[in-house]
Amino acid sequence: MELAHSFNLKDPQFLLNPYPVLSELRAHGRPMWHEEMQLWLAATHADATAVLRSKSLGRIYTPQEPSDLWETFNWLHADSIMENEGAKHTRLRALVSKAFNRGQIDRLAPRIQKIVDELLDNCEELGEFDLLADFAEPLPVRVIAELLGVSPSDEVNLRPWSQAIVKMYEFDVSVEEEVAARDASSEFAAMITTMVES
């Protein structure tokens, strides 16, 4: 089918309104190979669920090259829960889940409520606000900052760093985006190192 070859994920028209193409992909009824992107497109809920649950599919991190340029970025990703499968994934998930057990969440609840209240107060002061940009996006960032013990002065950097780093999961990443990802990785790692050493 030509559809799998007829769109570009970076095409401004596709980004503006991806829904007609996605609808056609779903109507096709099965995963399709996209030659340019070198990947399978699973557009239906059933296909996506099958892919995510398949034990024969997974992700093992492949370091960015050249390694001297990407050293910090690669270091941050090599032991990421999202980049590993099997026993290593299970071990990492067990470590992370300790931060989200019932007791931890109960202890954090008052602080989370305070963050929610602050964000809602800010939205009220704005009068007109963007629910995503002014509430839904900053909320998890501020909660994660609270979990990690990140200072308010560093907290404002978490989202831009994250956005720059995850850009590397997209297709056709520009040289500027690569530089931004490396810089964000270095700045984030430096912040964590400072926190651990203090």
Language-model features and meaning:
Residues M191-S198:
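Generic, well-ordered alpha-helical scaffold segments in large soluble proteins
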Residues M1-L132, V141-R159, Q163-S174, E178-S185, ...:
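Active-site substrate-recognition loop segments, prototypically the cytochrome P450 B′-helix/B-C loop
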